[in-house]
Amino acid sequence: MNRDSFYPAIACFPLLLMLAGCAPMHETRQALSQQTPAAQVDTALPTALKNGWPDSQWWLEYHDNQLTSLINNALQSAPDMQVAEQRIQLAEAQAKAVATQDGPQLDFSADMERQKMSAEGLMGPFALNDPAAGTTGPWYTNGTFGLTAGWHLDIWGKNRAEITARLGTVKARAAEREQTRQLLAGSVARLYWEWQTQAALNTVLQQIEKEQNTIIATDRQLYQNGITSSVEGVETDINASKTRQQLNDVAGKMKIIEARLNALTNHQTKSLKLKTVALPKVASQLPDELGYSLLARRADLQAAHWYVESSLSTIDAAKAAFYPDINLMAFLQQDALHLSDLFRHSAQQMGVTAGLTLPIFDSGRLNANLDIAKAESNLSIASYNKAVVEAVNDVARAASQVQTLAEKNQHQAQIERDALRVVGLAQARFNAGLIAGSRVSEARIPALRERANGLLLQGQWLDASIQLTGALGGGYKR
């Protein structure tokens, strides 16, 4: 070995010795891999239904100012949104707290102490009052003030990894806030259209009750004239009672829905007054392909992804803990036994300190922390994989339900048209004087009941379409 290569080798020897003396890092189980959905999710929907992804404010497509106002109130004042916002602020504060450890620190300190020296202790000579020797004991009033600086050198990237982990948590919390936003908007929209469905059903039931009352009045008149017996009107009376019971049930459901909307929108001070509007027409939409796009458009998947990224950075920080810590410290102070001497130039003291902490034997603490970090990371990855599978299943299930209900609505529309034709024929026969008016009412009641069934199916389709919008991410985009 020549002299030029000998000295660099000698210079690197302390570093090699330092690294060799670190606590050994044992091997752990292999990390899990993240799952991605298939390139295309087959939802078996007709091409005509595949019109694209939902918009971030998908509820505006209903063109209903009342619904928009309810959702805006919920997003602004709902307790769930407040909790999500505070979780983000907490994560940001924690990230800032970790980031402050990565830079230099500078402190100013000052103290004053009045003390009596012991003549029998280590500082015994200072207990004497001998001005010639520089002692004026036994009482002293000493003071110190000055600056102290420190810097923890993040050579192995431990602090940087911890900062990255915290920032990943911040991004995950932000995605969770968006998920809360979409869930809240979806819940308000579903309740709102359920209320509108019940309100429309209430109108139809009132029409049925009106027709039943017409039949009952006619039957009573015929009975009073001795044309029919009392038994013939019993069935109509029973049906009218059932209709009244259905009206009471609908009114109760509407009150429950209003109470739930009040809770979601934090609208507790006064009662919620909703106006009835027509239900939207049945129409479905779904993008042609999902695949990787679903990962970027589902806020819950993004939150799970960022938790995984955060956990991987936590592993890096746990690995960096096996290497030495290096700290630099410096101080510039004034220190004197007597306050009168505190501001003299001779009372000045200064120094620089370089410290090194080398983990050699820790009873397995560092390896245990590393095992915990890896286990938490594997748990985050497993949770992410589970969320991916559930997200794809949610889309497939919701899309299938939307398609099924759309087909049912089409069949129901045909049934309603046929029922109206029967009513038209009865009305024509009445106009020709061939049947009584009560027979027209008898023809209208089945048509109205089919209309009630159609409203329920339309409301079910609305609910399913909102669930499909949520399954597609509700307009969220990374």
Swiss-Prot record:
NCBIfam families: outer_NodT, PRK11459.1. It is a lipid-anchor. The keyword Lipoprotein applies. It comes from the Bacteria. A lipid is attached at C22 (S-diacylglycerol cysteine). GO terms for molecular function: efflux transmembrane transporter activity. GO terms for biological process: response to antibiotic. Keywords: Antibiotic resistance, Cell outer membrane, Lipoprotein, Membrane, Palmitate, Signal, Transmembrane, Transmembrane beta strand. This is Multidrug resistance outer membrane protein MdtQ. InterPro entries: OMF, OMP_efflux, RND_efflux_OM_lipoprot_NodT. It comes from Escherichia coli O6:H1 (strain CFT073 / ATCC 700928 / UPEC).
